[in-house]
């Protein structure tokens, strides 16, 4: 199974991924934020670097799915419908089920989380400006998805997420 988390910065994607993995061990988490710092020790957060790491996430997704692993995509807003479609097609070409989780919350909640995590989040470019930049270009995807409002209680969100994955 391929589980894709998408949403604006600060909407709780990584938090929900950690909750999922705690409830359902065995998923291999691919995080662009983690991969970026692994392959680029001093990232500049350029479009070229982003594209390189996104391509790496896609390649690794295919590799892991080919080897029977369940994969969770984290650390990517996936604001581009085309990039989300690419991940869906990687799974579809392998006849692997895909679940898309779209994380949402109030803008003030996201901005508060971003401010709280300033300097400690693996994405060094994460900030208020990035939030609004991503928001301006965020595209809907044409695939079924579960929208999770992370302003709601965590227990109900995790329950809905686990039910959606069955």
Segments the model singles out, each with a brief description of its role:
Residues 34-36, 78, 104-109, 153-154:
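Conserved nucleotide-binding/hydrolysis micro-motifs of P-loop NTPases
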Residues 92-114, 148:
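Conserved phosphate-donor/acceptor-positioning beta-strand/loop module used by diverse small-molecule
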Residues 11-67:
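Conserved substrate/cofactor phosphate-moiety recognition/catalytic segment
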Residues 2:
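Walker A (P-loop) ATP-phosphate-binding motif of ABC ATPase nucleotide-binding domains
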Residues 52-94, 98:
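Glycine-rich phosphate-binding loop used to anchor ATP phosphates in small-molecule kinases
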Residues 5:
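Hydrophobic anchor at the beta1->P-loop junction of P-loop NTPases
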Residues 116-160:
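Small-molecule kinase domains that catalyze NTP-dependent phosphoryl transfer to phosphate-bearing small molecules
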């Amino acid at each position: 199974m391929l589980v894709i988390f998408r949403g604006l910065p600060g909407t709780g994607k990584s938090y929900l991924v950690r909750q999922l993995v705690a409830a359902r061990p065995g998923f291999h988490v691919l995080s662009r934020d983690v991969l970026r710092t692994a392959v680029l020790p001093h990232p500049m957060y350029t479009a070229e670097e982003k594209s390189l790491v996104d391509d790496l996430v896609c390649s690794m997704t295919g590799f892991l799915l080919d080897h029977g692993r369940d994969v969770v995509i984290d650390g990517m807003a996936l604001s581009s419908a085309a990039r989300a479609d690419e991940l869906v097609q990687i799974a579809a070409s392998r006849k692997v089920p895909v679940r898309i989780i779209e994380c949402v919350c109030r803008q003030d909640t996201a901005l508060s989380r971003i401010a709280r995590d300033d300097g400690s989040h693996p994405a060094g470019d994460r900030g208020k400006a990035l939030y609004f930049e991503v928001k301006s270009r965020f595209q809907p995807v044409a695939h079924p998805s579960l929208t999770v409002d992370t302003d709601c209680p965590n227990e109900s969100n995790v329950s809905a997420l686990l039910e959606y994955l069955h």
